[in-house]
Amino acid sequence: MLKTKSSIILFILFFLACLLFFFKPLLYHFHSEKILAPDQMQSLVDNASQSLLANDVPVGAILIYNDSILSTGINTVYRDSNAGGHAEINAISNAIHKIGFEAFSKLDKQKLMLVSSFEPCMMCRGAIIEYNIRKVYFLKGKGLLHWWKNDLKQVRYEWSKVKVNGDEVQDSLFMLHPKYKSQ
C-alpha cells in the first residue's frame, strides 16, 4: 500500500515537472499584463521603426527606471554587422554608457524594467540575467515551438562543450585585474 502511494506521488511529481518543462515558455500568461505609459509605448514603437528603416528586424527596447526611460535600444544586427546588436542588449549597453557601469550596478533592480517589442531571445535573456534585470515585459511573445527548439539547442550545447587545460592562465589574468575577488 505504501509503495503504491509513493509511486503515485512520484508519478504526479514527474508529470508536473514535465508540464513545467514543456510549458515554461508560456508562464507569462499567468501574470497580469503591464500597461505602458503612452510615452513609453511611443518610444518602443519609434525604436522598432528605426530598426526597420535600417533594414533590420523591427525590434525596439526601452529600459525604464523609476517609471522614466533610462535608455533605449534598437536592433542593429544587420546595420552594424554585429551578432550582439539586439535591441535589448543595446538598451542595456546604452544605459551603462549613459550613467557608467558602477552607477548602473548600484541601481535598485526592483525599480528597473526592460520592455521589448518582441520576447527576448536566449542571448538577450542571458544579458538580462547577468545584469540582474528582474522585470521584463514584451509586446509579442514567441511560440511554444520556438522555445522547444531552443531547449534542444541548449542540450546540444551542454553535450558539445569541452573544457581544455589552462585554468592557471585564466586565473593569473583574473588576478591582474584590479577588481578581481578570488573565490
Segments and roles (model prediction):
Residues 40, 44, 87, 91-98:
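Stable alpha-helical structural segments in soluble proteins, enriched in small hydrophobic residues
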Residues 2-52, 110, 120, 126-183:
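Zinc-dependent deaminase
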Residues 82, 92-106:
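A contiguous binding-surface segment within folded domains or other stable secondary-structure elements
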Residues 70-77:
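Short beta->alpha transition motifs characteristic of CBS
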Residues 54-58:
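Short, flexible loop/turn motifs enriched in small residues
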Residues 59-67:
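Short beta-strand scaffold segments in enzyme catalytic cores
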Residues 105-118:
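Immediate flanking context of iron-sulfur cluster ligation sites
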Residues 77-90:
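A short, polar/charged loop-to-alpha-helix boundary motif
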